[in-house]
Amino acid sequence: TEREQIFLDKVESPKYHRDNVNGLFPFFENKVPEEMQGFYTTSEIDALRILKDTDRDVEKRMPVKLTKHYFEVAKKSKAIQHIVKATPNETNDLDGSEDPGFQMDYSPVEGLLHKYEMGLMYVVSTCSAHCRFCYREELIGRKEIERADGTVAKKGMAKIPEIISYIHSHNAIVAANGGVHPETGREKLREILLSGGDPMVLANSKIAAWLSALAEAGIESIRIGTKEMAFFPQRFDESFLTMLDRFHETYPQVGLRFMVHFNH
């Protein structure tokens, strides 16, 4: 629509420099910045190196990732270090399903979970840093998952055209059947949670595109789940906040909430 295009045309998308360390290799080869050397002890590095390229390789389970900002926080606390430091214990027991919650049984469109009243979307498959306890390691690690129809593939990311088409279709069927979908028993889809991964690693333009598309489709409440406030708080800058202000001005009827994750 015209109002959507006017909103999107004003979005600024600066580049952000998180100074990430990606993977264990920089720690193995001591190629991390000088101030980050020693984050893993020699014995910790040796224990992880032995597992490399074996079935118990911790990065086959989920890649290691760390921002400079979170390193500065973690270096002061052993407890916080455990959140992002890989250990051999992660792969002691690899039994079980990659989809223990059977989420794929409730995915009518790639990248969307619609099990309950609200919908949850995977809009990105990474975060600024990776918590080692992450319960979506199959998504972060890009693992193949068995679908309800028996096919096996990696979880796909949500795409705007497919999601918007599903919202319109679902809500039209609900409206035509007394407020309840005749097959699933679900009511009108009013609320969407943007998740992943962390939506805040996306550019402002991509976040804005999701927000406006969902608003135009009649979604009444949008939530964004993020740990970026802990990993890289500089992401919440003037350009991003200005975009949010303009979104509220353009779509005052839509509630927008941030679900901010911290460990403490």
Question: At which residue positions do the language-model features occur?
Answer:
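Flexible, acidic/Gly-rich N-terminal and inter-domain linker regions that tether
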Residues: 1-117
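Conserved, mostly hydrophobic/aromatic
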Residues: 70, 131, 224
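Residues in well-ordered beta-strands of folded domains
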Residues: 71, 122, 261
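Solvent-exposed, flexible loop/coil residues
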Residues: 84, 88, 235-236, 240
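Glycine-rich active-site/cofactor-binding loop and its immediate structural neighborhood
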Residues: 99-154
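Core AdoMet radical
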Residues: 136-239, 247-264
